[in-house]
From Swiss-Prot:
Residues 1-102 are annotated as: Disordered. Residues 8-17, 51-65 have a biased composition (Polar residues). It comes from the Viruses. Residues 75-88 have a biased composition (Basic residues). Not known. Encoded on a subgenomic RNA (RNA3) synthesized during replication and which is co-terminal with RNA1. This is Protein B1.
Length: 102
């Protein structure tokens, strides 16, 4: 009986910090993953449109090739977006020395 009570107390105690810690880490990763997923479908959506303009009959064959080429291209812009995010903090650091001069 006493052993059962101790186990029940230990279980919720361990589950609470574990769930909170895991949830916080996953919460940070999820938004990053969603951003990458959003970028993927946007680019292929533009490529099929180009393939249709080239030729509807042969568009099916060319569309597959254009989509494959578009996927590696999508990886390049992702790096550029990360650079843009890094730039704003740099701009914020510039006014700080000016305040010190004052």
């Amino acid at each position: 009986m006493l052993n059962d009570a101790k186990q029940t107390r230990a279980n919720p105690g361990t589950s609470r910090p574990h769930s909170n810690g895991g949830g916080s880490s996953h919460g940070n990763e999820l938004p990053r993953r969603t951003e990458q997923r959003a970028q993927g479908p946007r680019q292929p959506a533009r490529l099929p449109k180009q393939g249709k303009t080239n030729g509807k009959s042969d568009g099916n064959i060319t569309a597959g090739e254009t989509q494959r080429g578009g996927i590696p291209r999508g990886k390049g812009p992702r790096g550029g977006k990360t650079n843009t995010r890094r730039t704003p903090p740099k701009a914020g650091a510039q006014p700080q020395p000016s305040n010190n001069r004052k």
